[in-house]
Amino acid sequence: MKIIAISGYKSFIGNHFYKYNKKKIKIIHYKKDINNIFELKKFVIKNKITHFVNFAGLSRIKCSKNKIECMKTNFKSIKSIINFFNELNYKPMFIFISTCHVYGNSNNKIKENSKISPNSLYAEIKLKSEAYIKKNYQNYSILRLFNVYGPNQPKSFFIPDMIEKIKNNQSIKIDKSVRDFIHVNTVSRVINFIISKEITGILNIGSGRGQSLKSIINLIGNKLDKKPLLEISNKKSKIVANIKFLTSKGFKFKKNEKNFNI
C-alpha cells in the first residue's frame, strides 16, 4: 500500500497537488519545518511513509535575497532527508522538485542529458541537491519542472505579473524568448503517474511545446479583452522540454492539455 506524504503543502504546486488529489488518493501533510529532521524522522516512521514528495523550499526570488537560508532549506534539508532514508530498513521513494533553470538556452528541445548551465543561485543549489540525491540514494525521481502556471500563483511569477500589468495598462518590456508552459494540474497528474508507475531517474516535466512570451501575453490580453502595451527587444532565448522520456513511460497528455489556458 502506498502511503504518500508531501512537504511544502502551502506552496503553489504543493497546494494544488493536494487539492487535485483530495478525492483521489490519501496524502499526508508534513506540516513542520523541513529543516527539523528530528520531527521529520518521527513523522515518516510513525506514518510508515512509502513515497515522499518534497515541495518545500525557497523560491528563486527568495534565494537571491538570502543565500544562507537558501542553502539551508534547499540543500541541507535534502541532504538530511536522504541520509535519514538510508538509515531505514526500507527505502521510501523520494520525489524531488527541481527546475528547468539548471539548463542553459538551447535551439533544440532540452533532453535530460543536455548541457547543464544553472543561471542563478536557486538553480545552482537545486543542481547541488540533485547531485547529492543521485550519488547517495537509489529510489528517487528528480522532476525538472519547466514554466508551471495556474490559479493563485504568487504575483512574483511571470503569468500573474503579466495579468496585473495588462489590467493596469502598464508597459511590458519583454524579449523574443520562447518558453515551455505547463499547467499545475498537469504537473499534479504527472506526479501521480510517476508514483503509480514507480518511475525513477531524472525527468523533464513540461508540455514539450515552445511558445513566445509575446504570444502568451497576447493570449492573456485576449482573455482580459485588453491590448497589452508591449516593448519588445531583439534578445532571444529558448528553453523548451524534450519530454520523450516521460511519454516513453506511458504518460499521455489529454486533449488540449499542452495548450496554454488561463
Stretch-by-stretch model annotation:
Residues 25-43:
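Adenosine-cofactor binding site in Rossmann-like domains, unifying the SAM/SAH pocket
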Residues 2-22:
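N-terminal Rossmann NAD(P)H-binding glycine-rich loop of SDR-like oxidoreductase domains
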Residues 35, 65, 69-80, 116, ...:
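Glycine-rich NAD(P)-binding loop of the Rossmann-fold in SDR/ketoreductase-type enzymes
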